[in-house]
């Protein structure tokens, strides 16, 4: 298997990508004495209910005709491409838990990925869903076109791709629709022009606006943007160099502080860990 195509084989696997691209870890985790493989967990009924209700939110609020998942609810909302990526990862879980059938999940997944594949892209500020393979952060729930003046987002595109890859890995049968899910996922991933957003050496920008150009802020400190770097380096068509990883790691120690007591991350929100590590 091509070292970059492995991404479809294991969602977004950091270890395999790091090995294939010659990356080094930013730091080495400390060994935990007596640590072993986790055993089976029996969940509290409250947690079970929370999980199913969370699943039902995605299933019930997503536009079944095109796969657009709203950014919020119950107020009228636009779709979030990151939320769409989450939804694509949720459908297989729903099958595994017995909440929907594989046929239902397959149909919803293919509808979504096909809609995004066919969605018009271009430099125009309106009437398109993305540009150079990237998608706008927020899309109209019905047309899939850019909502308002939202940015073309590198991280939200990456989270969408993460969900697509999870789905492409899970739908592994010979069924024609499952093969199409895998094919379209690869096409969408391969057309993203990652180097275009490397406006500054070894740094990938957070995005672009057709009105003002590339955003000045970059993914260069520890936060939810790790998945952007992994996907960009692993691209089989438009890769960036491993210098973006070296730059990321060069400020790793500065991501921590002991200013207010025990050493901790400057960037503390839970999503800073969850968003990338759902897939990595």
Question: What is the predicted function of each stretch?
Answer:
Residues 39-43, 86-100, 115-118, 159-174, ...:
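Well-ordered alpha-helical scaffold segments within catalytic/enzyme domains
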Residues 52-75, 99-149:
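Helix-terminus loop motifs that line ligand-binding clefts
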Residues 45-46, 125, 129-157, 173-280:
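Extended ligand-binding clefts on enzyme/binding-domain cores
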Residues 47-59, 88, 106-117, 161, ...:
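Hydrophobic core segments within long, regular secondary-structure runs in both alpha-
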Residues 1, 21-51:
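C-terminal segment of N-terminal export signals and the immediately downstream linker at the start
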Residues 70-92:
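N-terminal, post-signal-peptide region of Sec/Tat-exported proteins
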Residues 40, 44-51, 77-84, 102-109, ...:
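Solvent-exposed, acidic/flexible segments
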Residues 5-27:
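N-terminal export signals
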């Amino acid at each position: 298997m091509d070292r970059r195509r492995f991404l479809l084989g294991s969602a977004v696997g950091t270890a395999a990508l790091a090995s294939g691209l010659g990356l080094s870890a930013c730091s080495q985790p400390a060994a935990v004495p007596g640590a072993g493989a986790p055993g089976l967990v029996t969940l509290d009924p409250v947690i079970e209910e929370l999980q199913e209700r969370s699943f039902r939110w995605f299933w019930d609020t997503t536009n079944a005709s095109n796969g657009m998942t709203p950014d919020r609810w119950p107020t009228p909302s636009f779709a979030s491409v990151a939320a769409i990526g989450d939804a694509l990862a949720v459908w297989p879980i729903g099958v595994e838990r017995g909440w929907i059938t594989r046929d239902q999940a397959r149909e919803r997944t293919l509808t979504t990925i096909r809609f995004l594949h066919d969605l018009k892209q271009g430099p125009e500020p309106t009437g398109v869903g993305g540009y150079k393979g990237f998608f706008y952060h927020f899309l109209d729930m019905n047309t899939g076109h850019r909502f308002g003046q939202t940015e073309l987002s590198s991280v939200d595109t990456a989270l969408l791709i993460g969900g697509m890859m999870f789905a492409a890995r899970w739908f592994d049968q010979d069924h024609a629709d499952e093969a199409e899910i895998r094919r379209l996922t690869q096409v969408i991933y391969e057309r993203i022009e990652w180097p275009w957003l490397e406006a500054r050496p070894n740094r990938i920008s957070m995005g672009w606006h057709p009105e003002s150009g590339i955003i000045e802020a970059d993914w260069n400190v520890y936060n939810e943007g790790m998945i952007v770097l992994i996907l960009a380096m692993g691209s089989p068509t438009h890769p960036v160099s491993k210098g973006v990883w070296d730059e990321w790691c060069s400020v790793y120690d500065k991501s921590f502080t002991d200013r207010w007591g025990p050493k901790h991350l400057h960037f503390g929100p839970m999503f800073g860990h969850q968003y990338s590590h759902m897939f990595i």
